Amino acid sequence: MSSARESQARHGLKRAASPDGSGSWQAADLGNEERKQKFLRLMGAGKKEHTGRLVIGDHRSTSHFRTGEEDKKMNEELESQYQQSMDSTMSGRNRRHCGLGFSEFQEGEEEAAGHSSDHESSEDSESGSDSKQDESAEELQAAETHDEAAVPETKKEAKSNYKMMFVKASGS
C-alpha cells in the first residue's frame, strides 16, 4: 500500500471528467449557426440530412426478373469460363512466366522451348496477333542461339546473359 501512495505522490492525482461538458463539440461557441454546422461537418461530428429515398434490397420497380432460359444460359457461360480457367491453371502454361514477357528457361527446358515456342506462336497467330508474335518469337530465338554460342560457366552467368539479351532485344 505504501508503494501505491508513493507513486501517487510522484505522479499526482488524476482529474475527474469535466462536468460542465467543455469537451462536447455541440457546446463550442463559434458564432452563428452556419459556422457551427460547418465546423461540426469538418470535424466529422455533424449529422447529414438525407436527401431522397433509401431503398435496401431489390424493389419491384428496379429489379429485372430473369426467365429460366436466361438462367440456364448464364450458368452454362459461367461453367465454361470456370472450366477454361481450371484447364489453364492445371496445364501450368502460365506458371513459367515471370512477367513482362520474360520467361526463365532451365537447362532441360531449353531444348523443349524451341518446340513449344513454335506451337505457341501458331496458336497466337490464329488469335489475330501475327506481327507481334512473329517479332517476339524471332527475338526469343535470336537470344537462344546467342546464349548457346556463348556457353557460360555458371548458371548465374547464364541467367544474366539471357536477361541482358532480353533487355537488348526489347530496347531496339
UniProtKB/Swiss-Prot annotation:
Annotated Basic and acidic residues bias: 46-76, 112-122, 144-160
- Where on the tree of life does the source sit, at the highest rank? Eukaryota
Record Pfam families: SMAP (PF15477)
Q: In which tissues is it expressed?
A: Expressed in brain, heart, eye, liver, kidney and skeletal muscle.
Q: What InterPro entries does the annotation carry? A: SMAP, SMAP_dom
Return the Polar residues bias intervals. 80-92
Query: Disordered: where is this region?
Result: 1-160
What family does the database annotate? Belongs to the SMAP family.
**Could you tell me what this protein is called?**
Small acidic protein
The organism named in the record is Gallus gallus (Chicken)
Q: Which gene encodes it?
A: SMAP
